[in-house]
Regions:
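Active-site catalytic microenvironments in core metabolic enzymes, especially phosphate/sugar-handling
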Residues: 1-156
Length: 156
């Protein structure tokens, strides 16, 4: 993420700000619309402070994770609806949330960006390229490589 952020617009999603309304979907969507031609990155920034102490901490953390996943899934869906042709999604839970939101019935599997991380084309949507990556692994240039392998420039 750090390397990609150096050359592309990026926007941090803050769990506690999403939960308490200090960060809105509309603000995030406006960022996407402004930078959509530059392949913007949305990423979870984590918590800047403990969300809550004590017994409620685990439940609050689950709410925070769910808020991040829902928001990123909605951004992905809306981006595709507005004409985006490629999505690169990192994080196991986030990838799952995005895949469920998009609802594709299957994928044609293409070349691998990294071991176990293929470029996929949804069945019935040959103009769309998707990469789902789980876990904190991969080379520092993963996002650049995935971007180069998706979309018109990635066609062979």
């Amino acid at each position: 993420i750090l390397r990609y952020r150096q050359e592309h617009p990026s926007c941090a999603l803050w769990a506690e700000k999403l939960l308490d309304g200090r960060q809105s979907y509309e603000e995030l969507w406006a960022f996407y619309q402004k930078y959509q031609e530059q392949a913007p990155l949305f990423y979870s920034a984590g918590a800047s402070e403990p969300l809550m102490q004590g017994e409620e901490e685990s439940r609050r953390d689950r709410w925070a994770a769910a808020a991040l996943e829902r928001t990123l899934a909605r951004l992905a869906q809306d981006a595709l609806t507005q004409g985006a042709r490629r999505l690169i999604v990192a994080g196991g839970e986030t990838s799952g949330a995005v895949a469920r939101q998009l609802g594709f019935e299957g994928y044609r599997i293409g070349d691998s960006v990294a071991p176990g991380v293929p470029v996929m084309v949804p069945l019935g949507s040959p103009q769309v390229w998707v990469v789902y990556k789980s876990g904190n692994f991969g080379e520092a240039d993963f996002f650049e490589k995935a971007l180069a392998m998706t979309g018109p420039a990635g066609e062979k």
